């Protein structure tokens, strides 16, 4: 990639229909894990006007009121009024879960008497990434796109901007100079709102001003906002119909929002609703953990990790390190250190990151990476010093 360029990432709020589905799926997973952390869960959700459908495969000894979990999640997000197209109190919730296939279970549960050699729950490839663009070691565009919609929800919920409604989308276009963030070229923020904030199809100035002054300016670093920065606030105008009424929401349709905003490749597997025996989720978390520790250790300014698995096999097919020329030692040497210091077998990952806990609903909006909450164990940099020592730095 050229040293001077524009790069864009987007995020969506917790009230976006696809994120509603993700949060319900992960709320189901958490409710099950509170009772039975050994459960196998693949919980999918569809949400539309007045309707939630729960389907997938679950094998558990837990007894969970799935319908109530779905309603509670809608309530927490803010879908508490029929005017919003779905109301937690009166919407229909259909449940259609099966058990995990025995053919899959035999490869996952009985691959070896040694539990650390339990096989991966599926084949696939996963990526992790870190860079030094932000203190959280995340790419700047996706990080600040998340913070915009997160603040939109905060101001909506605490009543400071009561005319906001749950659905929202953000987008940041960053101008890079010499390969580093230099300024924000464009900010896009579209927020669902109550009807009185528009004149026909045009937004009222009070809405534009509130979004600018109370959401965009407090979030975006002042030094990156210039006289040339463009602001597009509800650029199509009126946005009253939104959420599951505006679009059908499905689990797993925001995988780039969930990860790095397009700054690195994606293996294609979604996260939400999946227990950590599914390497789509757990190995992607582990790859982030590895990449973040490499950057935190000063071994590279940016780092991409690829891992791949075969179903029923514990050892990864490959662990590949790519630092895009920013490494202080060769990439293959960093890969050797990764093999020495990180156990990337599925059970090793689960132990290393303590993943058999009800921690997942919080991950399902505003990004799985680049957050400092204690539950996000894959964001720790506790291996950085060991990496530096092993590298001789």
From Swiss-Prot:
Residues that hold K(+) according to the record: 44
Annotated stretches, region: Flexible loop: 100-110
Cofactor(s) named in the record: Mg(2+); K(+)
Biological process, per Gene Ontology: one-carbon metabolic process; S-adenosylmethionine biosynthetic process
Documented EC number(s): 2.5.1.6
Cited Pfam families: S-AdoMet_synt_C (PF02773), S-AdoMet_synt_M (PF02772), S-AdoMet_synt_N (PF00438)
Pathway(s) of this molecule: Amino-acid biosynthesis; S-adenosyl-L-methionine biosynthesis; S-adenosyl-L-methionine from L-methionine: step 1/1
Chief location of this protein within or outside the cell: cytoplasm
Binding partners and assembly: Homotetramer; dimer of dimers.
Protein name as annotated: S-adenosylmethionine synthase
Organism per entry: Albidiferax ferrireducens (strain ATCC BAA-621 / DSM 15236 / T118) (Rhodoferax ferrireducens)
Gene this protein is translated from: metK
